[in-house]
Amino acid sequence: MTISVFDLFTIGIGPSSSHTVGPMRAANQFVVALRRRGHLDDLEAMRVDLFGSLAATGAGHGTMSAILLGLEGCQPETITTEHKERRLAEIAASGVTRIGGVIPVPLTERDIDLHPDIVLPTHPNGMTFTAAGPHGRVLATETYFSVGGGFIVTEQTSGNSGQHPCSVALPYVSAQELLDICDRLDVSISEAALRNETCCRTENEVRAALLHLRDVMVECEQRSIAREGLLPGGLRVRRRAKVWYDRLNAEDPTRKPEFAEDWVNLVALAVNEENASGGRVVTAPTNGAAGIVPAVLHYAIHYTSAGAGDPDDVTVRFLLTAGAIGSLFKERASISGAEVGCQGEVGSAAAMAAAGLAEILGGTPRQVENAAEIAMEHSLGLTCDPIAGLVQIPCIERNAISAGKAINAARMALRGDGIHRVTLDQVIDTMRATGADMHTKYKETSAGGLAINVAVNIVEC
């Protein structure tokens, strides 16, 4: 395993990990390289070209604004909503972006060149940055690819996209290898994952970082249920989380088990409404699927006996297990909607959440693997066809539906003994092959499916 749980679960801004978080990181990385090479003092102009899916749905996903902010030195992990909104307004008014926060160049969202019909060989989400000096002399140029979940690569680094590279004690590249490790050492999947994470940091640091991720998830939910009105983008999609919360809180003030599904739906809905509005979320493993893991973790904490006993321990074990399973999807297939459709985003997240819950419910490693397999098997073929290129319809409701699917998958797996006909590895390989066969119009281009069959009249608000 080369991918840390802290690469799969990262803090960023909405609405898209591949179209917002990744491009911001790429732009920032390009500026860091310019500074390192001593080119900033000579910089007079910047050109940005977007290709494929980034160009096709970038406007709805906030790609252009994310790139401008990244060029100014902003990072998705630390940028505040207030700073984002203020700087974008100033850039629009002045026509100037400050590269690295200091060098003014004429560049706005309208100056970014879009090439939706050109798909670069490495990945559908390609972007090229070109820095020019006096007399138009090219100082540097680099092409980056946003490969899903906020991961970015170049043609030279396509095999190492993680933010936390580290040699691990128990490497694996398949679910079978992970199960073999658990058998050999007589450990759970979360324990195996913890041994790998502690190769890079102490156990206390791992636990603290995972609990911080949970806290950010909860903060995201709380912000969302306090907000009303319409989501941005012109589709006039009304926020529902606050209304749902008020009604649920009145009907179920003591959190009775029969209302569990309603609360799970609410958490998923709240997270994805916050994501759709460009708020701070935990990528899990993508922004478009960011509501599933928090919703099922909410269930694990509030509606299981383990959660009643030690919610912090439940959080750590849940996220470690989910991360271990998520790394398999990243390594063996893809978590990018632009590459394999929504099955790679929502399907992967459902499998991760199902695995995490199965472990919390006392599942063996094989039952945990089975839970992930069930959730992914019944997500195969999901298309990514966001209406108007916005991460709203069908994305928000799909997270709630998939959170319920993950819980059901975990419960089904625990009714068995871990022996099952279809393996997780086979399902992951099938997902990759299905994504390769899927027509481009169903892979985050808004050129097919709901995106063209639902009439829209966009009025930007």
From Swiss-Prot:
It is an enzyme of class 4 (lyase). Its EC number is 4.3.1.17. Binds 1 [4Fe-4S] cluster. GO terms for molecular function: 4 iron, 4 sulfur cluster binding; L-serine ammonia-lyase activity; metal ion binding. This is L-serine dehydratase. Belongs to the iron-sulfur dependent L-serine dehydratase family. The keyword Metal-binding applies. It catalyses: L-serine = pyruvate + NH4(+). Disulfide bonds: none annotated. Pathway: Carbohydrate biosynthesis; gluconeogenesis. InterPro entries: ASB_dom_sf, Fe-S_L-Ser, Fe-S_L-Ser_mono, Ser_deHydtase-like_asu, Ser_deHydtase_bsu.
